[in-house]
Design a protein with these regions (language model features):
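Conserved N-terminal beta1-alpha1 strand-loop-helix module at the mouth
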Residues: 1-107, 112-115
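Glycine-enriched alpha-helix->loop->beta-strand junction motifs that scaffold or abut catalytic
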Residues: 87, 114-116, 135-141
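Short beta->alpha connector loops at strand-helix junctions that form conserved
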Residues: 94-95, 121-122, 143-146
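Short glycine/proline-centered loop/turn elements that form peptide/ligand docking sites
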Residues: 100, 149-150
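Glycine- and Gly-Pro-enriched alpha-helical subdomains that act as flexible
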Residues: 116-126
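Catalytic cores of alpha/beta
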Residues: 127-132
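Conserved small/polar residues in nucleotide/adenosyl-binding loops
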Residues: 154-161
Length: 161
């Protein structure tokens, strides 16, 4: 019997295949190379630690499979600016469309709205998504160990940008 996570990963594989058909790995790699250097996600956390402060990675999420719509009036750029004003250390942006109603466009528009380091929170299963994350403004990505084999984890780490 397929678990819910297995279903999500199968859907993600189809989505990534569609994205690759629309924009090649070479094209997205080029966009990633042309994008701004990443902001220091870990450096931001270390700086807070050195100041004796707690780091907060604030999440921007419209919905979840278990809770449904979390925030009906969802203005991701405004939420990001509010978090920045309240001194969040970094932001975590949900980009999975099918199950969390996220979007890469949220990541891109938030990048243009705030100066904080951004984490793309998605089900990363392919190197394409690493370059895509950078091209859309992410400073780091989430890798979920339970969906990756040791080999695929090592392969994805080899494509750090």
């Amino acid at each position: 019997m397929q678990s819910y996570l297995d279903k999500i990963i199968a859907t993600k594989a189809l989505v990534v295949a569609e994205q690759k058909a629309q924009e090649s790995l070479k094209e997205i790699h080029s966009k990633a190379s042309d994008s701004s250097p990443p902001k220091g996600f870990i450096d931001a956390i270390r700086k807070r630690d050195q100041q004796g402060l707690v780091s907060v990675i604030a999440e921007i999420k419209k919905a979840s499979p278990s809770k449904g719509i979390i925030r009906k009036e969802f203005l991701p750029e405004e939420i990001a600016r509010q978090y920045e004003r309240k001194n969040a250390t970094c932001l975590s942006i949900l980009t999975d469309e099918e199950y969390f109603q996220g979007s890469l466009n949220y990541l891109e528009s938030i990048r243009a709205s705030v100066n904080l380091p951004l984490l793309r929170k998605d089900f990363t299963i392919d190197e394409y998504q690493i370059y895509q994350s950078k091209a859309y403004g992410a400073d780091c990505i989430l890798l979920i160990a339970s969906v990756l084999t040791a080999v695929s984890y090592t392969h994805l780490r080899a494509h750090e940008t």
